[in-house]
């Protein structure tokens, strides 16, 4: 599933193409995604100029004068920028095209768990949309601190890794990035969230930011389907300290990496480096 780094890589790849350009038309070939594509979306966007592309959590917010169209990549979704001249014929899983003058923005989603939605400007701030309003803070914002994590986890018995994944404290820390961040912070993923001290949460906040920044720099992680807007795979997964390295020696101390299951998801950690 594309997480924050993959969505941010997509945003950075798309925005230089679409910002300041007008949508000539929208071709919706499959309206039944995770939620139905709004029936009037194509007409609503015709001849509209894209003003900006923002990311909130794992959602992409494309602003036009009348509102925002919101895209979520789901588990297998991608957005590709394709030259209008000689654009490939849409394949089975190519569900939506936004046609501009010189290129096509194509949404592909084999499993159809993604979404394309509309938020009209008269409905108010897009960040108040029901899917966005309850999201945690952005990891690169000043609001994301060790003190925030410490305060929000007092009395909680859930594991620190599961608390990170929940998304109500901080957005975008998916499974691979939670394991990697906890390794960098030296925190064992099974530790109860409420038992982690403030200094250790301060290290964890720094580790989350560093891990996500490194992943973005490397084009995200391609475990199955993800490619960026230019069709290239990410390669962060090649440099992981612990993720998907069960039985291999820790890159720091040489201890074999362990794999366990938490909340039906695989967790990887070093039993020596993480306490």
Curated annotation (Swiss-Prot):
Record-linked HAMAP family: Fapy_DNA_glycosyl
Q: How is the cofactor bound?
A: Binds 1 zinc ion per subunit.
Q: Which UniProt keywords apply?
A: DNA damage, DNA repair, DNA-binding, Glycosidase, Hydrolase, Lyase, Metal-binding, Multifunctional enzyme, Zinc, Zinc-finger
Q: Give the matching PANTHER family.
A: FORMAMIDOPYRIMIDINE-DNA GLYCOSYLASE
- Cofactor(s) annotated in UniProt: Zn(2+)
Cited function: Involved in base excision repair of DNA damaged by oxidation or by mutagenic agents. Acts as a DNA glycosylase that recognizes and removes damaged bases. Has a preference for oxidized purines, such as 7,8-dihydro-8-oxoguanine (8-oxoG). Has AP (apurinic/apyrimidinic) lyase activity and introduces nicks in the DNA strand. Cleaves the DNA backbone by beta-delta elimination to generate a single-strand break at the site of the removed base with both 3'- and 5'-phosphates.
Cite the binding residues for DNA.
Answer: 93, 111, 156
Q: What is the lineage of its organism?
A: Bacteria, Pseudomonadati, Pseudomonadota, Betaproteobacteria, Burkholderiales
Q: Where on this chain are zinc fingers (FPG-type) annotated?
A: 241-275
Q: Per the similarity annotation, which family is this?
A: Belongs to the FPG family.
Entry annotation: catalytic residues: 2 (schiff-base intermediate with dna), 3 (proton donor), 58 (proton donor), 265 (proton donor)
Listed CDD domains: EcFpg-like_N
Q: Which SUPFAM superfamilies match?
A: Glucocorticoid receptor-like (DNA-binding domain) (SSF57716), N-terminal domain of MutM-like DNA repair proteins (SSF81624), S13-like H2TH domain (SSF46946)
Task: Give the quaternary structure.
Answer: Monomer.
Q: What is the name of this protein?
A: Formamidopyrimidine-DNA glycosylase
* E.C. number(s) listed in UniProt: 3.2.2.23, 4.2.99.18
Q: Which Gene Ontology terms describe the biological processes this protein takes part in? A: base-excision repair
Catalyzed reactions: Hydrolysis of DNA containing ring-opened 7-methylguanine residues, releasing 2,6-diamino-4-hydroxy-5-(N-methyl)formamidopyrimidine; 2'-deoxyribonucleotide-(2'-deoxyribose 5'-phosphate)-2'-deoxyribonucleotide-DNA = a 3'-end 2'-deoxyribonucleotide-(2,3-dehydro-2,3-deoxyribose 5'-phosphate)-DNA + a 5'-end 5'-phospho-2'-deoxyribonucleoside-DNA + H(+)
Q: Which GO terms describe its molecular function?
A: 8-oxo-7,8-dihydroguanine DNA N-glycosylase activity; class I DNA-(apurinic or apyrimidinic site) endonuclease activity; damaged DNA binding; zinc ion binding
Query: Which SMART domains does this one have?
Result: Fapy_DNA_glyco (SM00898), H2TH (SM01232)
């Amino acid at each position: 599933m594309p997480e924050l780094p993959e969505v941010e890589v997509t945003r950075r790849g798309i925005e230089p193409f679409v910002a300041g350009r007008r949508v000539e038309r929208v071709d919706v070939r499959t309206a039944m995604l995770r939620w139905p594509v709004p029936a009037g979306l194509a007409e609503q966007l015709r001849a509209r100029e894209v003003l900006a592309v923002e990311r909130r959590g794992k959602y992409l917010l494309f602003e036009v004068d009348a509102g925002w169209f919101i895209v979520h990549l789901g588990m297998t979704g991608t957005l590709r920028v394709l030259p209008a001249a000689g654009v490939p014929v849409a394949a089975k899983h190519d569900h939506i095209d936004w046609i501009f003058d010189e290129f096509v923005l194509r949404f592909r989603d084999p499993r159809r768990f993604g979404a394309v939605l509309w938020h009209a400007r008269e409905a108010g701030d897009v960040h108040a949309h029901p899917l966005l309003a309850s999201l945690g803070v952005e990891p690169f914002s000043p609001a994301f601190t060790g003190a925030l994590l410490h305060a929000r986890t007092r009395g909680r018995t859930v594991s620190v890794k599961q608390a990170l994944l929940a998304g109500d404290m901080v957005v975008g820390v998916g499974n691979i990035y939670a394991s990697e961040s906890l390794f960098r912070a030296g925190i064992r993923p099974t530790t109860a969230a409420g038992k982690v001290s403030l200094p250790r949460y301060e290290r964890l906040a720094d580790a989350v930011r560093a891990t996500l920044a490194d992943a973005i720099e490397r084009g995200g992680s391609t475990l199955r389907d993800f490619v960026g807007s230019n069709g290239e795979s990410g390669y962060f997964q090649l440099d992981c300290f612990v993720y998907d390295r069960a039985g291999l020696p820790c890159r720091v101390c040489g201890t074999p990496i362990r794999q366990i299951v938490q909340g039906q998801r695989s967790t990887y950690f070093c039993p020596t480096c993480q306490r």
